[in-house]
């Protein structure tokens, strides 16, 4: 029988529910259980694919091509699993499916209502996420906070699950903020008490509290919360602020969180062996050397827009025994005159993905600087496309060369729309998304990075591609297409082999990086940057 764990939040949003859920998932996995995890987002968008990164941070893409919340990146990195389209559910997606069923007459003339039709659809998503992965345990995080109007159907579905599958198979975990008032010199429990009261008013009694706090709460605070919120004192878990997020599973384990969960759900498993994870955390906490990486991006004011890129760099730093000293460079402010000032002290330059004209010329300048000064450079997605544009302009002397996305009237469309995208008008969910194979050129930097594998599978999110009409011209000038699709139509990886490291990929390598298994192309880049340290 599958066990269901539901993680809700109160008092404030962005309290760390996703990290709590991911940490618990790691602990349960290390007990030998098969775990999956999903995020419920109560916004009306179908998915975050068309949302501005300023609104929502990065869009995380799964193997099967779902555009999802960035929390899924935390889930995959912590638990080291690959999720699917059932792992991210939004209000928009549910209502869209319910309305389509109504139009097809599948409700047989019934009045379509939130209860039971919307709640049934939500419960079906929970169960489908578990069955498609054959999981012992599924953890479901509900975005936002208790009391939000948008969350009500989701919480009602969670309430109903207890009756559907039995109380021994369901556990509710509520995360809240425990604020410390410096002037009063004490922690305040009232916000948590009121949040739990609100949750209980919706028919859900939490079995565990996770309290986010800046400093240890002490047993008296835990006892008080236990008394007023009707949970066991040992089930009040502190989520202390830490220097590194990968410490959190160890902190949770030290408070027996996973054992309490297993006891409640009647799961008999051995204790979680966190030896390897603990060794990784010890290493992370004691890195002495730093390598400086300049990230030239469009959305640098919001680091969450590049969350997976940053994490992948960190993971590759662990392999090289270095911390990443990240220098954020706003591509929109980069010019030929100031590029040396902005990136001249960097040991490596990364140009990540993005969309639109703004900042593209600044990214091209950064790529030119890296090529001309032999600074290790990694381009990703749009970064790969602009690497091709830069080479066309400055080496092949194709003046006015550009991407057709950025300049539809360019005389040299080095990057053009994919053939199967030409007649598509909708923006959402229509990109080339998900896992696709890439055939690597023997003897190339890319092949070396991937331990000389012939084919790798990586996740994509793009609509435009390299225009193969220019391929021979590029190759004649020494530009190497070191990764291509198996049918040889799509150029996936490009490089200049005479440079220290000048490689760019159409796919998103960062989406498959893990703290205990860094993504290989990122690792090769960071290794080159370390060798280039000033």
Curated annotation (Swiss-Prot):
GO biological process: 'de novo' CTP biosynthetic process; pyrimidine nucleobase biosynthetic process
Catalytic activity: UTP + L-glutamine + ATP + H2O = CTP + L-glutamate + ADP + phosphate + 2 H(+); L-glutamine + H2O = L-glutamate + NH4(+); UTP + NH4(+) + ATP = CTP + ADP + phosphate + 2 H(+)
Keyword flag S-adenosyl-L-methionine: no
Binding site for ATP: 14-19, 71
Keywords: ATP-binding, Glutamine amidotransferase, Ligase, Magnesium, Metal-binding, Nucleotide-binding, Pyrimidine biosynthesis
Regulation: Allosterically activated by GTP, when glutamine is the substrate; GTP has no effect on the reaction when ammonia is the substrate. The allosteric effector GTP functions by stabilizing the protein conformation that binds the tetrahedral intermediate(s) formed during glutamine hydrolysis. Inhibited by the product CTP, via allosteric rather than competitive inhibition.
A GO term for molecular function: identical protein binding
Record InterPro entries: Class_I_gatase-like, CTP_synthase, CTP_synthase_N, GATASE, GATase1_CTP_Synthase, P-loop_NTPase
Chain residues that bind L-glutamine: 54, 354, 382-385, 405, 463
Coiled coil region boundaries: none
Class in the EC hierarchy, top level: ligase
Domain Glutamine amidotransferase type-1: 292-534
Enzyme Commission number, as recorded: 6.3.4.2
Amidoligase domain: region residues: 1-267
Record: active site: 381 (nucleophile), 508, 510
Binding site for UTP: 13, 188-193, 224
Gene Ontology cellular component list: cytosol
Pathway assigned in UniProt: Pyrimidine metabolism; CTP biosynthesis via de novo pathway; CTP from UDP: step 2/2
PANTHER family with a match to the protein in the record: CTP SYNTHASE, CTP SYNTHASE-RELATED
Note: CTPSs have evolved a hybrid strategy for distinguishing between UTP and CTP. The overlapping regions of the product feedback inhibitory and substrate sites recognize a common feature in both compounds, the triphosphate moiety. To differentiate isosteric substrate and product pyrimidine rings, an additional pocket far from the expected kinase/ligase catalytic site, specifically recognizes the cytosine and ribose portions of the product inhibitor.
Quaternary organization: Homotetramer.
Similarity remark: Belongs to the CTP synthase family.
Protein role: Catalyzes the ATP-dependent amination of UTP to CTP with either L-glutamine or ammonia as the source of nitrogen. Regulates intracellular CTP levels through interactions with the four ribonucleotide triphosphates.
Protein name, per record: CTP synthase
Organism: Streptococcus agalactiae serotype Ia (strain ATCC 27591 / A909 / CDC SS700)
Lineage: Bacteria, Bacillati, Bacillota, Bacilli, Lactobacillales
